[in-house]
C-alpha cells in the first residue's frame, strides 16, 4: 500500500466559517497541528496554509486551502505539483452529509458525492484516485436545507460527536501513514462498544 505524503483539510477560509459543519476537514488538520505543536504558514504559491509534521515518525505535509471550498482543487493540485507528490499519496479530509456526526470513514477512489471541494479536485486531477477521510456531519433531512446546514454551526451534541470522529481518525492515522489502509479502515469503521 501507498504511504501518505500530503494531508489536506477542506473548508472555507475566514472566521465566519471557522466553526461550520462544512469545515470538518479544516478541523481534522487543525487537530493534527495542535497535537504536533507545529504552526500554519501562508504559502501564496500553493493558495493555502501549509505545515510539515511527523506522524508515526514519518514526515507529512498538511494543507488548508485558502480558496473557498468550490476552488479547493487549485490549491491541492498546486501542492501536488510543487512537492512532486502523486495523488495516491494524498488524503483529503472533508465533511460528509451522508454520515452521522460521530462517524468517520476512510476510502480510496470514487466520485465527489456532491462535495464541491472534491468535485473541483477530481475535475483538475482528471480522476478520483486519492484517499479521503469522510467526517460525518449528518443530513438536515431535505435537500433544500443542505446549504444552510453545511454553512451553519453544529449543536453542542453534534459538535462533540464530530470532534470524537476527528480524534478517532487521528488515532488510526499512523496505520495510514505506513500505507496500511485496510487495517486503518477496519479499526476506524468498527463501532466502539
Curated annotation (Swiss-Prot):
Alphabetical keyword list: Cytoplasm, Hydrolase, RNA-binding, tRNA-binding
Keyword match Iron: no
Site positions for Stabilizes the basic form of H active site to accept a proton: 95
Top-rank taxon, per record: Bacteria
Annotated GO CC locations: cytoplasm
Keyword match Transferase: no
SUPFAM superfamilies: Peptidyl-tRNA hydrolase-like
Any one Pfam family match given in the protein's UniProt record, by short name: Pept_tRNA_hydro
Gene Ontology biological process terms, A to Z: protein quality control for misfolded or incompletely synthesized proteins; rescue of stalled ribosome
Listed EC numbers: 3.1.1.29
Location within or outside the cell: Cytoplasm
Main location: cytoplasm
Catalytic activity entry: an N-acyl-L-alpha-aminoacyl-tRNA + H2O = an N-acyl-L-amino acid + a tRNA + H(+)
Residue numbers marked as site, Discriminates between blocked and unblocked aminoacyl-tRNA: 12
Residue positions of the active site: 22
Molecular-function annotations in GO: peptidyl-tRNA hydrolase activity; tRNA binding
EC supergroup of this enzyme: hydrolase
Amino acids binding tRNA: 17, 68, 70, 116
UniProt family annotation: Belongs to the PTH family.
Described function: Hydrolyzes ribosome-free peptidyl-tRNAs (with 1 or more amino acids incorporated), which drop off the ribosome during protein synthesis, or as a result of ribosome stalling. Catalyzes the release of premature peptidyl moieties from peptidyl-tRNA molecules trapped in stalled 50S ribosomal subunits, and thus maintains levels of free tRNAs and 50S ribosomes.
Oligomer status and interactors: Monomer.
Record-given protein name: Peptidyl-tRNA hydrolase
Amino acid at each position: 500500500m501507498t504511504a501518505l505524503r500530503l494531508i489536506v483539510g477542506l473548508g472555507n477560509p475566514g472566521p465566519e466559517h471557522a466553526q461550520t459543519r462544512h469545515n470538518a476537514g479544516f478541523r481534522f488538520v487543525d487537530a493534527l497541528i495542535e497535537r504536533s505543536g507545529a504552526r500554519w504558514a501562508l504559502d501564496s504559491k500553493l493558495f493555502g496554509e501549509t505545515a510539515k509534521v511527523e506522524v508515526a515518525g514519518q514526515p507529512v505535509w498538511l494543507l488548508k486551502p485558502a480558496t473557498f471550498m468550490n476552488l479547493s482543487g487549485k490549491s491541492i493540485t498546486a501542492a501536488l505539483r510543487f512537492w512532486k507528490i502523486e495523488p495516491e499519496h494524498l488524503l483529503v479530509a472533508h465533511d460528509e452529509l451522508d454520515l452521522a456526526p460521530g462517524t468517520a470513514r476512510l476510502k480510496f477512489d470514487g466520485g465527489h458525492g456532491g462535495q464541491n471541494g472534491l468535485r473541483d479536485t477530481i475535475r483538475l486531477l482528471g480522476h478520483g484516485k486519492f484517499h479521503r477521510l469522510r467526517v460525518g456531519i449528518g443530513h438536515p433531512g431535505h435537500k433544500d436545507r443542505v446549504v444552510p446546514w453545511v454553512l451553519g454551526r453544529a449543536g453542542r451534541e453534534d459538535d462533540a460527536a464530530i470532534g470524537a470522529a476527528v480524534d478517532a481518525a487521528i488515532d488510526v492515522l499512523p496505520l495510514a501513514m505506513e500505507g496500511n489502509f485496510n487495517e486503518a479502515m477496519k479499526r476506524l469503521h468498527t463501532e466502539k462498544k
